[in-house]
A protein has these predicted regions:
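Solvent-exposed interaction patches of small proteins and small membrane subunits
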Residues: 1-123
Length: 123
């Protein structure tokens, strides 16, 4: 693997780490809530990018996000539970992108602690 590719992996990992390490579990105001949502969204996107990069670097054709997660779990002998959690995180990202109401906001905020732990486990 060349240095540029390694740097891309590092950049994605650093993004996740930088954006979620101090992420509060509960916002104090609307601005902080937006920051939490943005940090979760971009961190999950980086996780999905890492999965796609691993799939490609394993010589497997890259497909849609859920298929890539399944493929990397199978190819790297990861626990199926981890794959399911990564898929759930990707679904949460979709909720973040297409937020429709305050009920979904509560689901997202209630997931912050679990998503932080999952992303740290993944990287």
């Amino acid at each position: 693997m060349d240095e540029i590719r390694i740097k891309r992996y590092r950049d994605k990992i650093n993004h996740i780490t930088d954006y979620i390490k101090d992420l509060p579990l509960e916002p104090k105001n609307e601005l902080e809530k937006r920051g939490i949502f943005y940090s979760l969204q971009t961190s999950i996107e980086s996780m999905v990018d890492l999965v796609a990069m691993l799939v490609k670097d394993s010589g497997i054709p890259v497909k849609e996000d859920y298929a890539n997660i399944s493929e990397i779990v199978k190819n790297k002998n990861l626990k199926p539970e981890l794959g399911e959690k990564l898929k759930e995180a990707n679904s949460l990202r979709n909720l973040l992108v297409h937020r429709y109401n305050s009920f979904e906001e509560r689901i997202i905020l209630d997931s912050v602690k679990e998503i932080k732990a999952l992303l740290f486990k993944w990287i």
